[in-house]
Curated annotation (Swiss-Prot):
Name assigned to this protein: tRNA modification GTPase MnmE
Enzyme class: hydrolase
SUPFAM superfamilies named in the record: P-loop containing nucleoside triphosphate hydrolases, TrmE connector domain
Names of the cofactor(s): K(+)
Species assigned in the record: Lysinibacillus sphaericus (strain C3-41)
Family listed: Belongs to the TRAFAC class TrmE-Era-EngA-EngB-Septin-like GTPase superfamily. TrmE GTPase family.
Any one GO CC term of the record: cytosol
Gene3D superfamilies to which the protein is assigned, alphabetical: P-loop containing nucleotide triphosphate hydrolases (3.40.50.300), Probable tRNA modification gtpase trme, domain 1 (3.30.1360.120), tRNA modification GTPase MnmE domain 2 (1.20.120.430)
Gene that specifies this protein: mnmE
Binding site for K(+): N233, T252, I254, T257
Length: 461
């Protein structure tokens, strides 16, 4: 497949030690050769692949020196895109990197679209669609475990499993074709039905195993949606600041200071938390605060974990007890804050209301109890769930939806075969399952979906 030559800045914009401008395509080396001058004056076209060269970029129209650079030359197909690739390392300033990019564009390259380098890797057969999506997961990973899951998917872990499932279905379809081609032989159909049921059952079971990892995989990918809950002025914002280790929320003695929800990502002992500091949930006449309270209720409904904060120096109120009832069926940790003040809270009643849920005492003002809280969060998350590093996790919402559809169609095939439906009719569901699994890795997917997926990538990737 032939494409034009593209170029883009592949590093984040801003000031830094270096920046990289990447070119990919049949003319990448020729374009670079027009603008690159080495001390020895030798052409890049004579250089070996996978080599690095020092020199200057020079505008061929004016002979003006634009930048001092290191240039990496890599010839296809042993590159990310399977095309000729040139990466120009220049100084990391906004003006510098933009001048380098403009020089490449005015000498024959086209500005790359978002995700176009990865899209070319997919279209040229270097990676499949699930591996391409894993590239973005790797970039966005917020913990080591999330990064390891993305690396496993990039390495083809999920692709190989999906390939095995599709191969089993293909073998089943081949057996069905034999039955269709030789309908006069009853024993052929008698052999076909058990094989079909056996292989489809194995495929279904493997799909179910994958889907069982989806909740953990989604958390690793997107973070554990964690709501900080409690009455106003019990220390919710102080807790957010302690976990994030920055002053993201206003901390005052005035109840109701947090009028809106505040979100922040934080890595707590390998657990990615998407922390939401809510406005205190209470009845209020203040219109602005009431909007914040309603948003807090919405956040609560979508939470994976609740950090329920109580005040050690206050008696339990009817509002506290109502909040216990609200979160009764959810995963939560009770945090009794302000232990540096005289005790007024009834600890026995808190234990009774919390039941089996963990209780941690803290004095966030004195920075006490935060370590114990982090340990409690990690213990809750990792308890028998996610320690097995050899699991293949599925976390992408598109993959999960396709797996659910594939499970439904393969179960229809099993039920139909067992009910005595002719195998040529059962074949329809088996084929549809094969197609749905193919959409995960991009074998059976529409071009419009491919374009949409890659448009979500950043420029230069």
């Amino acid at each position: 497949m032939e494409f034009d030559t593209i170029a883009a800045i592949s590093t984040p914009m801003g000031e830094g030690a270096i920046a990289i401008v990447r070119l990919s395509g049949d003319e990448a080396v020729a374009i670079a050769d027009k603008i690159f001058k080495s001390p020895g004056g030798k052409s890049l076209t004579t250089k070996d692949s996978h080599t690095i060269h020092y020199g200057h970029l020079v505008d061929p129209k004016t002979n003006e020196v634009v930048e001092e650079v290191m240039l990496s030359l890599m010839r296809g197909p042993k590159t990310f895109t399977r095309e000729d690739v040139v990466e120009i390392n220049c100084h990391g300033g906004l003006v510098s990197v933009n001048r380098v990019l403009q020089l490449a564009l005015t000498n024959g390259a086209r500005l790359a679209e978002p995700g176009e380098f990865t899209k070319r890797a997919f279209l040229n057969g270097r990676i499949d669609l699930s591996q391409a999506e894993a590239v973005m997961d790797l970039i966005r990973a917020k913990t080591d475990r999330a990064m390891n899951v993305a690396l496993g998917q990039m390495d083809g872990k999920l692709s190989r499993l999906i390939g095995d499932l599709r191969q089993a279905l293909l073998e089943t379809l081949a057996q069905v074709e034999v039955n269709i081609d030789y309908p006069e032989y009853d024993d052929v159909e008698e052999m076909t039905v058990p094989v079909l049921v056996e292989k489809c059952t194995w495929v279904r079971d493997e799909i179910i195993k994958l889907l069982q990892t989806s909740s953990q995989g989604k958390i690793l990918r997107e973070g554990l949606s964690t709501v900080i809950l409690g009455r106003p002025n019990v220390g919710k914002s102080s807790l957010l600041n302690s976990l994030v280790q920055e002053n993201k929320a206003i901390v005052t003695d005035i109840a109701g200071t947090t009028r809106d929800i505040i979100e922040e990502y934080v890595n707590v002992r390998g657990v990615p938390l998407r922390l939401v500091d809510t406005a205190g949930i209470r009845e209020t006449e203040d219109i602005v605060e009431r909007i914040g309270v309603e948003r807090s209720r919405e956040a609560l409904r979508g939470a994976d974990l609740i950090l329920f904060v109580l005040n050690y120096a206050d008696e339990l109120t009817a509002e506290d007890e109502r909040l216990f009832e609200t979160i009764e069926a959810m995963d939560y940790i009770v945090i009794i804050n302000k232990t540096d003040l005289p005790q007024k809270i009834n600890l026995a009643r808190v234990k009774e209301l919390a039941g089996k849920h963990r209780i941690v005492t803290t004095s966030l003002l004195q920075e006490e109890g935060v370590t114990e809280l982090e340990e409690a969060i990690a213990a809750l998350f990792f308890e028998g769930q996610i320690e097995a590093g050899d699991l293949t996790y599925v976390s992408n919402a598109r993959h999960i939806a396709l797996l659910h559809q594939a499970q439904a169609t393969v179960e229809d095939a099993i039920a139909a075969a067992q009910a005595g439906v002719p195998v040529d009719m059962v074949q329809i569901d088996v084929t549809r399952t094969w197609e749905l699994l193919g959409e995960i890795i991009g074998d059976t997917v529409q071009e419009s979906l491919i374009n949409q997926l890659f448009s979500q990538f950043c420029l230069g990737k």
